[in-house]
Amino acid sequence: AELTSCFPVG
């Protein structure tokens, strides 16, 4: 569960 999975903010 990576944050970037929901928040693609680099």
UniProtKB/Swiss-Prot annotation:
GO terms for molecular function: toxin activity. Disulfide bonds: none annotated. It comes from the Eukaryota. It is found in: Secreted. Keywords: Neurotoxin, Secreted, Toxin. The keyword Secreted applies. Expressed by the venom gland. One of its GO terms (cellular component) is extracellular region. Belongs to the neurotoxin 04 (omega-agtx) family. 02 (Tx1) subfamily. This is Toxin Tx1. It comes from Phoneutria pertyi (Brazilian wandering spider).
